[in-house]
């Protein structure tokens, strides 16, 4: 009878570690594909906000340069990626309010990757709007 009691205690002691491991896995899975972008520059010079970001490794572009005048997109330039599409995105959102650009671009998927170059732009803009840029 004592062996059964100790065996039960051992099993119960092991269960929380299994559950804890499962919780970590769930947290990891909730991280969205494409969240590995990095804002490398975010500063205001003479009233223009300059944002440079390294997008997710899941997309073809390797850099996004954004200029904002207040809450309006002044220009967007992608480095690498689909040249015509990248130029098209920049031309289409020039003059658009940042919130509108985010709303239109966020969630666009490319080839089942869970993100895209337009989605990365939306994510970068969204993250940038939540922080204060350096002022020079």
Functional labels for PLM-detected ranges:
Residues 4-14:
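Bacterial N-terminal signal peptides
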Residues 12, 29-33, 130:
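Short amphipathic alpha-helical "recognition" segments used for binding
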Residues 18-31:
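Cleaved targeting-peptide boundary
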Residues 28-56, 66-67:
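N-terminal secretory signal peptides
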Residues 48-50, 54-135:
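Active-site- and interface-proximal helix/loop "cap" or "latch" segments in soluble metabolic
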